[in-house]
């Protein structure tokens, strides 16, 4: 079953001579349990694709469905409920709550969904431990490095019972070892049935995906199923 369906999705900004086509007739389907990596040069539309897929921005035309629901036909409140219950986000600003510790930030989505606090904290601590952050669980965001905050945000996105993960450069501030730990965590979440769309410039990390989609000038230029390895992807994004 497709968790995310995008059909002929376009996004245009501005008018007349100033018109910019960020996305052009995008078709993308992501099934439960699948990880799709999105690659392409800067300005190719990767981040716009994520914000539209996550109902944070409306397309100029086309249809977007998450868990079978047409986002373009839902009310604002219904879209907000769908985002909270079904979609995990990792964007480059991390968006951690400053008054909560790392463990509390990770556990929060579970508690909002009614998971008992003790069980939610246990799941949060396990996710942090898998990313090498067990000793940072009681630290507040301003006590963490940028890379540590990034890993906390990723743990929070995958620990809940979300159906879809949308991640923009989840390994951007991380070294190779921590980047691979992040991809292992996302891969494990997909094995449990979550669908994931990961924007990355890193061919090594994209090779974890079941499929790689290449964007250029807002269009899908190619798709590669089950990448053979990072070397096979490098030429596509140059």
What is each residue range found by the language model?
Residues 1-2, 235:
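Short, low-complexity, intrinsically disordered N-terminal peptides in bacterial proteins
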Residues 2-208, 215:
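ABC family nucleotide-binding domain
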Residues 219-238:
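Conserved beta-strand-loop-alpha-helix hinge in the C-terminal portion
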